[in-house]
């Protein structure tokens, strides 16, 4: 029974976990510190530490919360973190579970702005080639700003003064606060849903601090400005203020009044320009008419108009010369053709087929006779050579040798005996004469050296 007073490790960790859960001060903790051991894990949960001068605590930030972080955390950066404290049972260690993280201080806002600007610049959102041209004579202008501020008043007064023809439509939105970015995006999407109804859009607000102007630096607002089909004029803050909306817009104006001036032409200036063009056009037309009248007078007073027949004298002379040249050319052509005809007849006579056929017949007979004579000579030569070869063969024939009284000897196997070294005593031999054979038996073998061997 004494063992019941001992807790298991799991039981103890569970008890401590419940203590943390039941402590209201640990349910929502606002913590500030410096990021330590931060290693960004792509598409995953983040594990790091927060520290100050004296201590540190382990932090876990699940992916669903980290994806909402609007800046790029880095090692050593000071941050504000919101979350709760709990125990990780398998290791028996308590840690901080972060649900939100923001950079600490105004310097952090500038750092966040800098990081987003670099990111969007790499994507090409600020490139000049993406800038759209502002139309010169807009029919309808959409304005995204606060409904109660001086911005819309300045824009409408300026636009109506300069170009009353243009219609101004306000799409009210919050321009400051936590929900301002969402409100700005919603207003721009309403404009985009109208298709090509609007020729240009103005987005802006009055001056303020960096925190006041921050909605115009939010990534979703900047991307929506970039995606608008019509040209966008940005007028956020004073001339010294520059937001990311100013950079991505097709044009930037220092004030709302300047934005309205950028979007609309000055009607009086345009009318003055039209009157000036009309005057120039009228003057040009008068000059052209005067020049044409002077030319007409010169033509009417010319000798050709007074005596029209002279107009054709030169042409008639030209026609006569051309006729003569044509006749001469035809006669020359005819003469050349006759000469060519005579030459062709001469060539045809020279190559008369009957004459060529007779020549070929005579040549064939001559060649046939030469072939017959050559064949006779050839056969005669071959017969003589054949007779000589037959005589030589007959002279070297063994039968001729036998006719002169010589014999040749073979053993009983029919092999020719040419030396006494091939026979032994009592061997049977055959002696061959020209008219028959004689069987013989060796009685004695006697070897004699001839004259060549003695030498």
Curated annotation (Swiss-Prot):
Similarity remark: Belongs to the XseA family.
GO MF: exodeoxyribonuclease VII activity; nucleic acid binding
Presence of keyword Cytoplasm: yes
Class in the EC hierarchy, top level: hydrolase
EC numbers, comma separated: 3.1.11.6
Subcellular location field: Cytoplasm
Major localization listed first in the record, in broad terms: cytoplasm
Keyword Acetylation: no
Keywords, comma-separated and alphabetical: Cytoplasm, Exonuclease, Hydrolase, Nuclease
Subunit note: Heterooligomer composed of large and small subunits.
Catalytic reactions on record: Exonucleolytic cleavage in either 5'- to 3'- or 3'- to 5'-direction to yield nucleoside 5'-phosphates
Role according to the record: Bidirectionally degrades single-stranded DNA into large acid-insoluble oligonucleotides, which are then degraded further into small acid-soluble oligonucleotides.
Top-rank taxon, per record: Bacteria
Record-given protein name: Exodeoxyribonuclease 7 large subunit
CDD domains: ExoVII_LU_OBF (cd04489)
Organism for this UniProt entry: Lactobacillus acidophilus (strain ATCC 700396 / NCK56 / N2 / NCFM)
One GO biological process term: DNA catabolic process
Gene Ontology CC, one term: cytoplasm
InterPro entries named among the record's database cross-references: Exonuc_VII_L (IPR003753), Exonuc_VII_lsu_C (IPR020579), OB-fold_nuc-bd_dom (IPR025824)
